[in-house]
């Protein structure tokens, strides 16, 4: 607390997460009182909460424990915490761990006393997998390489004030599924396994009042925003080319936001990109280099799974590799990785205070690529 109490990101202190012994009311209230005193003594400016665990079962709302908190927090079960507020409207309430689905969002959006939610989780993580061979949780808005997933764009369409639009293709029945997960799989591509004439189901996430969908320049119709925050959907007869969504709002002076997906051809080359060009020579100085398998026109090939090898020279070293495949058992500390959904990443660290770094990516049958980086910069 003393280390972080002046940091502007601190808005609440938590006295515990999913404490299972709260049914012993007097014991748990005594412990909680001591914790609250420590928080208030060391920082009287910020409120204290606790992530209650099934408080209806442990009677936390009726035995006085919840009302010891400045802000009542509960994990999941949004209807319970809303009922607790209705029971006692002076309670300030917050979701301390919540799912990322639409029902959870609507509980927040449509109930002003519900001050906010902490979503589990922002990024996919190792562990808590559903079943072997999956070794990670796919519940994040971002995958393990930092790429925004469809759920992330969906949440952005609910939360952001900046106009946005994102197209996602729902994986057809029989098409390869790439994750073990409960929600239908969506991919940001227009390259299905089946290239013969058939229908594809498309979801568009957008906070714009109107979205119009185009396939190869032909309009497939415009749809208004749904009051229940559900995505706008189209059934699209597949043909190769460009699928484009255009989002519009009133009083935009004709300006619009767009997103498009393009059908990929055969894999032809590796394209390298990085999140920075200079890497500080310190413990957390790291650069993420993304290797994308593309066709001859530079269009990413989403189904490519080539084994990509990385070689580095100069003042750098490969710290780890990854591809965001939650069923992959490949080692992270290596210099090669299979592409997953057409891409993988290498994490590069500086091996000297200054100097040039060259990273090359190769794979059988693909044109190789090299990216120039440098050690140095802010420390």
Residue ranges and their predicted role:
Residues 257-266, 366-379:
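Short beta-strand elements
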Residues 218-227, 320-336:
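Solvent-exposed serine/threonine-rich low-complexity stretches and specific carbohydrate-binding patches
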Residues 233-238, 332-352:
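Short, hydrophobic beta-strand segments
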Residues 283-289, 355:
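Short, solvent-exposed loop/turn segments enriched in Ser/Thr/Gly
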Residues 267-272, 310-327, 379:
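Short aromatic-acidic-glycine turn motif
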Residues 1-26:
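Active-site groove signature of glycoside hydrolases
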């Amino acid at each position: 607390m003393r280390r972080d109490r002046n940091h502007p990101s601190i808005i609440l202190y938590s006295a515990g997460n999913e404490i299972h012994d709260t049914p012993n009311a007097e014991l748990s209230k005594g412990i909680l009182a001591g914790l609250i005193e420590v928080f208030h003594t060391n920082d009287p400016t910020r409120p204290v909460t606790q992530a209650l665990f099934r408080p209806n079962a442990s009677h936390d709302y009726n035995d006085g424990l919840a009302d010891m908190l400045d802000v009542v927090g509960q994990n999941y079960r949004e209807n319970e915490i809303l009922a607790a507020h209705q029971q006692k409207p002076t309670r300030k309430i917050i979701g301390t761990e919540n799912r990322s689905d639409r029902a959870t969002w609507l509980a927040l959006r449509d109930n002003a006393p519900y001050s906010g939610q902490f979503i589990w989780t922002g990024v996919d993580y190792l562990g808590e997998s559903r079943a072997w061979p999956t070794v990670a949780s796919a519940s994040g808005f971002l995958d393990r390489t930092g790429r925004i997933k469809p759920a992330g764009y969906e949440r952005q369409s609910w939360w952001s004030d900046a106009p946005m639009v994102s197209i996602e293709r729902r994986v057809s029945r029989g098409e390869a599924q790439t994750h073990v997960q409960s929600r239908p799989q969506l991919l940001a591509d227009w390259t299905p396994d089946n290239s013969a004439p058939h229908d594809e189901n498309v979801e568009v996430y957008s906070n714009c009042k109107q979205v119009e969908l185009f396939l190869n320049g032909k309009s497939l119709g415009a749809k208004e925003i749904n009051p229940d925050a559900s995505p706008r959907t189209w059934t699209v007869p597949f043909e190769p080319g460009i699928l484009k969504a255009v989002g519009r709002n009133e009083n935009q002076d004709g300006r619009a936001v767009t997103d498009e997906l393009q059908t990929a051809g055969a894999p032809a080359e590796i394209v390298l990109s990085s999140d920075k060009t200079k890497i500080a020579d310190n413990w957390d100085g790291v650069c993420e280099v993304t290797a994308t398998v593309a066709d001859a026109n530079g269009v990413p090939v989403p189904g490519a799974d080539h084994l990509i090898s990385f070689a580095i020279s100069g003042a750098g070293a490969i710290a780890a590799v990854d591809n965001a495949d939650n069923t992959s058992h490949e080692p992270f500390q290596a210099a090669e990785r299979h592409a997953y959904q057409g891409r993988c990443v290498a994490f590069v660290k500086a091996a000297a205070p200054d100097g040039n770094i060259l990273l090359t990516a190769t794979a059988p049958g693909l044109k190789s690529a090299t990216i120039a980086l440098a050690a140095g910069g802010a420390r």
